[in-house]
Each structure stands twice: as C-alpha cells, then as structure tokens.
Amino acid sequence: MIKVGILDSTLREGEQTPGVIFTVDQRVEIAKALSDLGVSMIEAGHPAVSPDIYEGIKRIVKLKKEGIITSEIVGHSRAVKRDIEIAAELEVDRIAIFYGVSDIHLKAKHKATREEALRVIAETISYARSHGVKVRFTAEDGSRTDFDFLVTVSRTARDAGADRVSIADTVGILYPSKTKELFSALIREVPNLEYDIHAHNDLGLAVANALAAVEGGATIVHATVNGLGERVGIVPLQQIVAAIKYHFGIEVVKLDKLQYVSSLIEKYSGIPMPPNYPITGDYAFLHKAGVHVAGVLSDPRTYEFMPPETFGRTRDYTIDKYTGKHALRDKYEKLGVKISEAEMDQILAKIKSNTTIRFYRDVDLLELAEEVTGRVLKPRPPEQIEALISVKCDSNVYTTSVTRRLSVINGVKEVMEISGDYDILVKVQAKDSNELNQIIESIRATKGVRSTLTSLVLKKM
C-alpha cells in the first residue's frame, strides 16, 4: 500500500533559485500558506546561512508552538556541529543533515575517504539526536553514489539515530525505472528506515522520478512551489500532488488552494509563471481547437484529465481561426447575445479570414456581431473583469514596501513601480464588478496608499 507525503522546500531549496530572496515576513507568510495547504513538512531554511533565515525560522517555530502552523518544521544543516547547534536552539521539529556521498563529492568537495565520511555522518547525526530532535540524513548526490556504499551510508545514518534518509538526485540524472529499482533495493537492504526523494529537474524527469520513487517505497517527496530551486529547480509542488491524486488516488494537500500558493510564490520570488505551466498556468484548462472545444462542451473528460474545479480553476476556450461553431455559439450564449445560424456562419467566416488576431476578446465578438447583424447589442456583465489601477503613494513612504503589501491582495496579478504622476501600477482580475470593487477597496486601505485611478481593460491584442 502506497503511503506518501510532501516536504515543501520553497523556503530552502526555492530560495537557492538565482535572483530569489524572501524577506522574513514573506518567509512567515509562505510557511503559513504551506501549512494551510496541508504539506506534511516545511523545510524552513538553513539557519546558519544568514540572520534573516534564522529569524524567519524562529518566527515560524513560534507559530508552530501556537498551533497556527501544523506542518513539521525542518531546519537544514551541514554535517557540522555548529550548524546543528544553531538549528537545535531554534527548536525545530527535525534537523536535516546533508553530506555529499558520491566519489565525486568526496574527492572534490570534502577531500575525504569513504571511511572518513561515514565517521562524520555518524558523529553529526548522533550529536543532533543528543539535542532531542528528530534527524533526517540527506545523501547528497546519492543517485551517482556506488550502490553498496549508499547502503552502508543509509545503515550508518539509521544506526546513528536518523529515522529518515533522503536520496538526492542532485544533478537530475535518474530516470523512472532506475529510480524505482533504487528505492526498492535500499528498502530491502536497509529496513526500519523511511526514505525521501529529492529530485532535481535537469532532464525534465523530476516528477516522473518522484512518482517512481513512491512506487519503490519512498514516503516523502521533496517539492517546491512552481518548481523553484538550484539551476532548473526540483519537483514542482502543484504537478506532483496532481499526479499523486490521479495515479494513486491520494490527496496529499488541499488541491483547491494550489492556485493561491502558486500566485503567492510567483509574486514573492519575482519569477513569472509560464502560461502553459501545468495545473496553475493560465493555459492549463484553456482550450483552442474547434474539435477540442466541441468535445469539452459535450463532456469535459474528452480533453481534461481532471476537472479544473479540483484545483480551484475554471475552464475556458479561446476564439480565433481554429474556432468551430460550437465554441462560438456557447460564447455568445454566455454573453447573452442572440445570434441566428446564418449570422453565426458569417461571423465565423470573418474570424477565419482574419488570421492575424491571436485572441478574440468578448468586446471583439460584440463588434463582429453588431457588424453582421446591424444591431446595437447589450451583453450581460462580463464574468471576468481585468483592470489597471494606478496608485499614488504618500510622500513619506518607501514605494517598494507599498508594492509588497499590494502584491498579496487576492485578485492582484502583477504590481509594477512606475514613473510619472502615479507611483505604482496594479493589474487585477475579478469575476464581477462586486469583486473588483472589493479589490479596489483593499488597495485603497493599504498602508501608504494616498489615491487610486481605475481603468478597465476593454481589449487585448
């Protein structure tokens, strides 16, 4: 029977993404969001690295003690006693000690023999355990380590007091069948020990390798929101939890909260989400080809592996030269506009003859319908409203601090500091005018905001 949970490493591995830095307040907010999402463990950072990481973990542990955060809190540490002491004094639930165990790492980085490495591993794990904290040992570059030595490393870690060993595919070279075989063999050779998979995505196989590791017996998958991490990152959280739900029938987090957490990390990391990103990208449940849209309108299962509502999303489709009559009719019905079959044929012909337009927005379709029918059409209020809100800040505030506060308001998609009469430009999206008004009021109520000017987006080219 498969048993699996998620360790989220956005605050540790994720912050190792080039150009990404989280403030202390952001670290705390992210930890709360991850706990609300339901991840089993939060790797809160390596406290010996810098004072801000230390302070962030301190505040996160405090929230754990108060019951606000429920996930297990993990502190990262080198196999160095001072690192362990710093993590232990923060009273984290678990210390994760890492050490490179491949011959490449032993020779080039540690300048150590295998025997010396085993001694360091045993001593530091025992030292951490003496502080009354649980220990996970990470076999860094485990995927390129001689198997017999990896068995010895795992056994040494277990005997020294670690209850978990993480096998790190540090340069992302594993492939699924080998991954499953590796974990199955380790569990067979070194029982009474739980295993994690830490899969990097250098070959684009991180999710597949994580699933294979779970099949092989791994019980914790390391992931980061939006797949952040060193180089090209590790297992993307939203992808692995969706795959676990689909393939194993296990809901390891609250799937409908993924979009919020993904957007939060997108804002704080400054790394934009590609529109075609699985699960949380703008195109994840957006259909285009006429045959596809007709199928989805008849039965969404034709072109969707799971309903978008599972992930707090909605389905939609684009209108362009690929569009068929089913999609066009449905779009006009949603707009509340009555179009005859003959008029529909004329509109569709106009759309297909203009091959340069990438997206037909609702306003474009109304213009076409008015052109064909000769009538002035009054549509229903739009289901999605996009707006640009110009913000003027108080003269005595730091604009960047206001920008950060605005970036976490629900409905805010992008925040930019600008020159001119206004200081900040905010892009927002709302399902209706009531929600738009609520977003605007939240922006106006933000500390440091003096005034706003709202412009509705009517057309995108």
UniProtKB/Swiss-Prot annotation:
CDD domains in the cross-refs: DRE_TIM_IPMS
Residues reported to bind Mg(2+): 13, 198, 200
Enzyme Commission identifier(s): 2.3.3.14
All copies of domain Pyruvate carboxyltransferase, residue ranges: 4-259
GO biological process: L-leucine biosynthetic process; lysine biosynthetic process via aminoadipic acid
Annotated residues for binding of 2-oxoglutarate: 12, 76, 136, 170
Entry annotated with the keyword Ligase: no
Catalytic residues identified in the record: 292 (proton acceptor)
Substrates-to-products reaction catalysed: acetyl-CoA + 2-oxoglutarate + H2O = (2R)-homocitrate + CoA + H(+)
Keywords: Amino-acid biosynthesis, Lysine biosynthesis, Magnesium, Manganese, Metal-binding, Transferase
Recorded coiled-coil stretches: none
Cofactors, names only: Mg(2+); Mn(2+)
Stored NCBIfam families: LysS_fung_arch, PRK00915.1-2
Function noted in UniProt: Catalyzes the aldol-type condensation of 2-oxoglutarate with acetyl-CoA to yield homocitrate. Carries out the first step of the alpha-aminoadipate (AAA) lysine biosynthesis pathway.
Entry similarity comment: Belongs to the alpha-IPM synthase/homocitrate synthase family. Homocitrate synthase LYS20/LYS21 subfamily.
Protein name stated in the entry: Homocitrate synthase
